[in-house]
Amino acid sequence: MNDQSMTIRGKDRYKSGVMAYKKMGYWEPDYVPKDTDVIALFRVTPQDGVDPIEAAAAVAGESSTATWTVVWTDRLTAAEKYRAKCYRVDPVPNSPGQYFAYIAYDLDLFEPGSISNLTASIIGNVFGFKPLKGLRLEDMRLPVAYVKTFQGPATGIVVERERLDKFGRPLLGATVKPKLGLSGRNYGRVVYEALKGGLDFTKDDENINSQPFMHWRERFLYCMEAVNRAQAASGEVKGTYLNVTAATMEDMYERAEFAKELGSCIVMIDLVIGYTAIQSMAKWARKNDMILHLHRAGHSTYTRQKNHGVSFRVIAKWMRLAGVDHIHAGTVVGKLEGDPNTTRGYYDICREEFNPTKLEHGIFFDQNWASLNKMMPVASGGIHAGQMHQLLDLLGEDVVLQFGGGTIGHPMGIQAGAIANRVALEAMILARNEGRDYVAEGPEILAKAAATCTPLKSALEVWKDVTFNYESTDAPDFVPTAIAAV
């Protein structure tokens, strides 16, 4: 779009009154971002009649140093340095009235190692700006100098696998169902049967904390008894994600300490506790040698809509900085929102040391993670044993596959559900390691395994026709164009 700078220079720049943002220095098409700049990509939908350049410049201004009128105190600062600079505005393909705005922020605008401070600027005030119909933060480029101020995941994928002594396959889990209403004893029974049947983990759901039907301490005691018995019976390392989410940090620390005293290797928190609390728990987890699982409870309130909010790829980047070890990242084939290419982009952010620009996955910038540990993505929500070949193909092996209903809803019982999932996974991994086309042959591989495994046979019969084929609300805006061979 318009590549001419409109910035007013000299004393007229600070004349009292209202001035267009693009004339105040927030639109600089000649600006070349520095390696140390934080770069944000916004999807901007201006109100009818609002100039897209002015709208993008307003986003830059309101997320950095500007207010609605000129203030003379700007002259007391290094204003040229501290102003965010929108340097590029492009129409969004196939989305009339929407524009991608690229905005660069000087690193000195942000407190080191603070997600709360970063978000207070980038998404703090500007999303309610009246000249915009909608605003969405699509992606960010975080400079190495900034990334290095964060601790990153407390444990990381490599150490977690070493601790569990499980390699070469996805980990298996299940969320205890029903999520609310069970007594502590019955809750522990579910955990025991699922782990004994072959799962690696079970987990609390996002809203099980400490309610009248089951106090948190009671749940922790019964769950860890179940874990210990399942480990003794199977000879494998097992775990259960004990949700320590609570009303205050003091309560969360108390619950986490109790989980540690009982011998748990992992604790869980919800995204809704907030960025400061998440970072605090991540520091506790590293100090106490614990794995930290994050349930992304509440994320869809601002990640799902295409024209307003924050993309989950950005949330994933923030959480890798913050220091969680596990994060729910979508399933593609399950019941929850998840375009295949977009979801692959989320998984790339979790697991790669360097993310190259990959527009078909929604990744707009190269991202160097500066040796921060990798996060283990978690696939959960509406998946079952009959999809095992698809899950392995789409999500890879560094992932936790959580079959909640697909374990506990098994017609032969919880342990049988766990056996079905474990046998299906082992059969698919064997086929992959033998060099077979396990994606194309997946149904055949599962049918052969089911011939000698009644629980798997039953699972395939019950859920064979269950699919969740709905159009995604968040597909990438760019896809590769085929080039004819010459």
UniProtKB/Swiss-Prot annotation:
Extra remark: The basic functional RuBisCO is composed of a large chain homodimer in a 'head-to-tail' conformation. In form I RuBisCO this homodimer is arranged in a barrel-like tetramer with the small subunits forming a tetrameric 'cap' on each end of the 'barrel'.
Upper classification of the organism: Bacteria, Pseudomonadati, Pseudomonadota, Alphaproteobacteria, Hyphomicrobiales
Cofactor binding, note field: Binds 1 Mg(2+) ion per subunit.
Protein's UniProt name: Ribulose bisphosphate carboxylase large chain
Obligatory cofactor(s): Mg(2+)
Induction: Expressed under CO(2) and H(2) autotrophic, but not under heterotrophic growth conditions.
Reactions catalysed, as given in the entry: 2 (2R)-3-phosphoglycerate + 2 H(+) = D-ribulose 1,5-bisphosphate + CO2 + H2O; D-ribulose 1,5-bisphosphate + O2 = 2-phosphoglycolate + (2R)-3-phosphoglycerate + 2 H(+)
Keywords: Calvin cycle, Carbon dioxide fixation, Lyase, Magnesium, Metal-binding, Monooxygenase, Oxidoreductase, Plasmid
EC number of the protein: 4.1.1.39
